[in-house]
């Protein structure tokens, strides 16, 4: 895991990325390296790899980022490939209860970077779907699960 000063230097806009809300308990397991797969009911309509910014619920800050380099399908019974079950930090019953017999997705976490200085939501530009495509706009509240944002490329 790399640490860097996320607010240093200038920035420029990049490609589409994801802002993902994660509870403090799971953030700690991600930071420790124990949790390397984040389970979600949905996934972005883009192929890996893509950047994900971690919004830590409770403190209201973006604490870091990771590269989602693989998406693992979890079938409707909450079954996950055996080699992928442990890195979710979920018991089979928890996984089944969360997905409620629906299909889910395991987002693989790689290239984790935790910011020395957590960032505010207003520093990010959201992307919303319009009839003309994706349009940029301010983020006024955190996503319930995840949302598209513009990728920030920090210099310095």
What are these regions (language model features)?
Residues 10-156:
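Structured alpha/beta reader/binder surfaces that contact nucleic acids or chromatin modification marks
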């Amino acid at each position: 895991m790399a640490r860097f000063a996320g607010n240093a230097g200038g920035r420029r806009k990049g490609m589409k990325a994801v802002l993902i809300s994660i509870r403090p308990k799971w953030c700690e397991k991600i930071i420790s390296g124990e949790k390397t797969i984040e389970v979600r009911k949905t996934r972005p309509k883009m192929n890996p790899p893509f950047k994900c910014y971690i919004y830590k619920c409770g403190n209201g800050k973006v604490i870091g980022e990771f590269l989602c380099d693989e998406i693992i399908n979890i079938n409707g019974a909450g079954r996950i490939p055996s080699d992928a079950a442990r890195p979710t930090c979920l018991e089979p019953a928890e996984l089944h209860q969360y997905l409620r017999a629906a299909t889910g997705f395991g987002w693989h976490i790689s290239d984790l970077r935790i910011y020395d200085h957590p960032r505010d939501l207003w520093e990010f530009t959201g992307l919303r779907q319009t009839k003309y495509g994706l349009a940029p706009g301010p983020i006024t509240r955190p996503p319930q699960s995840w949302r598209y944002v513009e990728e920030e490329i920090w210099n310095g």
